[in-house]
């Protein structure tokens, strides 16, 4: 069997197995007696001419096929992602490294351009690249981000900041007031309080900042920043609860109520990567 044929056989097998899991719940002797429910889309809008109004980009930070399979088997053979009809693969190499990082990959998603590892919203020559929220604002769309990482984490920062190095936390926070975000939620309020007084002041000029969901404050605000305490964005194993789904719903409701044109929302599950680093 030659190498080329082996490669084609592998790709065929991969897609065959994925399509099988997308159509049927995997059977087996599972130990988890309390699985999370999964969602099966209706696919009613497939192949229709109706224009897309809202776009939600969901990023599992550091997630690959091993994580999807592990999650599926740990959840009695079912996940929402494996209920989808199609899958795709991308090359993740950055402009200067074979192995990318969250800054370069986040920038690739937010701008459509490859860059060097560590760069946020900038190219290899440290020139600013417009991100999706900035581009979409010119067409009347509003944008938001939700993450279980800190706000200055590389993935969320790639959607609003322009800095040459991901470790420039103070500068990343200082970019927030001039961003095109209408909603953001990330960790944490404690981190926000550590920023320079002038940066806090500028952020509060642009955003209503809340530590807990507050209907009155939410209703009155023009732009909203939900910065919960650090424990709210911790690992699920550390009793995070339903923070991510409930905050995602909050973001959808908030953005929907403030734009008739539509919105873009990036949602990141950051703890996949953090757990994989320790595995």
Positions of predicted regions on the chain:
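Active-site His/acidic residue clusters
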Residues: 154-159, 231-235, 259-262, 266-279
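Phosphate/oxyanion-binding active-site loops and adjacent basic polyanion-contact surfaces
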Residues: 165, 240-248
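Bacterial N-terminal signal peptides that target proteins for export
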Residues: 1-9
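Sec/Tat signal peptide C-region and signal peptidase I cleavage site
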Residues: 18-22
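The substrate-binding groove and active-site-proximal loops of carbohydrate-active enzymes
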Residues: 120, 235-240
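Active-site regions of oxyanion-processing enzymes, predominantly non-cytosolic
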Residues: 212, 217-227, 247-270
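N-terminal catalytic scaffold of extracellular/periplasmic and nuclease hydrolases
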Residues: 23-193, 201-216, 223
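Bacterial N-terminal signal peptides
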Residues: 9-17
């Amino acid at each position: 069997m030659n190498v080329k044929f082996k490669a084609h056989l592998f790709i065929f097998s991969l897609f065959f197995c994925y399509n099988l899991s997308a159509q049927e719940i995997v059977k087996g002797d599972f130990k988890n007696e309390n699985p999370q429910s999964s969602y099966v889309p209706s696919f009613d809008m497939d192949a229709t001419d109706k224009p897309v109004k809202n776009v939600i980009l969901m990023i599992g930070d550091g997630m690959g096929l091993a994580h999807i399979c592990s999650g599926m088997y740990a959840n009695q053979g079912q996940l929402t992602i494996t209920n989808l009809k199609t899958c795709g693969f991308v090359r993740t190499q950055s402009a200067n490294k074979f192995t990318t990082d969250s800054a370069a990959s986040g920038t690739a998603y937010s701008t459509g351009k490859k860059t060097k590892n560590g760069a946020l919203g900038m190219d290899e020559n440290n020139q600013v690249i417009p991100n999706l929220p900035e581009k979409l604002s010119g067409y009347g769309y509003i944008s938001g981000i939700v993450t279980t990482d800190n706000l200055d984490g590389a993935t969320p920062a790639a959607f609003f900041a322009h800095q040459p190095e991901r470790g420039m936390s103070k500068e990343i926070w200082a970019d927030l007031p001039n961003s095109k975000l209408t909603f953001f939620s990330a960790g944490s309020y404690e981190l926000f309080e550590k920023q320079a007084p002038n940066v806090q002041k500028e952020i509060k000029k642009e955003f209503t900042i809340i530590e807990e969901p507050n209907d009155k404050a939410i209703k009155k605000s023009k732009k909203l920043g939900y910065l919960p305490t650090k424990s709210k964005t911790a690992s699920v194993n550390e009793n995070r609860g339903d923070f991510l789904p409930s905050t995602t719903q909050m973001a959808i409701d908030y953005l929907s109520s403030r734009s008739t044109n539509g919105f873009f929302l990036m949602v990141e599950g950051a703890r996949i990567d953090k757990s994989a680093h320790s595995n």
